[in-house]
Amino acid sequence: MGNCQAGHNLHLCLAHHPPLVCATLILLLLGLSGLGLGSFLLTHRTGLRSPDIPQDWVSFLRSFGQLTLCPRNGTVTGKWRGSHVVGLLTTLNFGDGPDRNKTRTFQATVLGSQMGLKGSSAGQLVLITARVTTERTAGTCLYFSAVPGILPSSQPPISCSEEGAGNATLSPRMGEECVSVWSHEGLVLTKLLTSEELALCGSRLLVLGSFLLLFCGLLCCVTAMCFHPRRESHWSRTRL
């Protein structure tokens, strides 16, 4: 009997208080959205990318980290006239050879396909110049020079000074000592959330979503137990 009365009270509340019903539904949807988004962030801490951007700087630089570069010798021929130059600050390691205490310049021209580019950009050339100094800096500056529309259009990583980027030169032959470029796995190259920050956001969204769902449940229980329809007065019944 009590369950029937509680259900009847809840039905009357739904019928006579539409604003309260709308507010409850909004809270319910927010709670479900928080649970869904929080679960997604906890299960997809890596690999989050916009489907509208075919190539981003993270994958671009990781492809670059698989290449091999050689020191440039003193002979210079010609100038590189790439109209689009981007200077990026990275923490790439250029090896620990005998010349690691000297300032070195590494330079290479690679096809877009070697950098993970596809379509018409795969056949375009990209000039990459890196100047490794002996100073204890926060990272290594890389200069990418190419025609417009080749380099990634996503938000760039932390940029560095572009001084000397326009003076990049091509060498007719490379030195004998080449090094492999590599980066630590999971290196954060762009201003994105780390896996720890994603986990924190996901857990907080789960807590918020659970709280909203519990609040909606508590609101329904209180309404079912305490809501009583207003009795019609004798004067109202007489007028009817």
Swiss-Prot record:
Coiled coil: none annotated. Residues 1-38 form the signal peptide. It holds the Pfam family TMEM219. It is found in: Cell membrane. GO terms for biological process: apoptotic process. The chain crosses the membrane at residues 205-225. The keyword Membrane applies. Residues 39-204 are extracellular. The keyword Heme does not apply. Glycans are attached at N73, N101, N167. Its main location: membrane. Keywords: Apoptosis, Cell membrane, Glycoprotein, Membrane, Receptor, Signal, Transmembrane, Transmembrane helix. Residues 226-240 are cytoplasmic. It is a single-pass membrane protein. GO terms for cellular component: plasma membrane. InterPro entries: TMEM248/TMEM219, TMEM248/TMEM219_dom. Widely expressed in normal tissues but suppressed in prostate and breast tumor. Interacts with IGFBP3. Interacts with CASP8. Cell death receptor specific for IGFBP3, may mediate caspase-8-dependent apoptosis upon ligand binding. This is Insulin-like growth factor-binding protein 3 receptor. It comes from Homo sapiens. The gene is TMEM219.
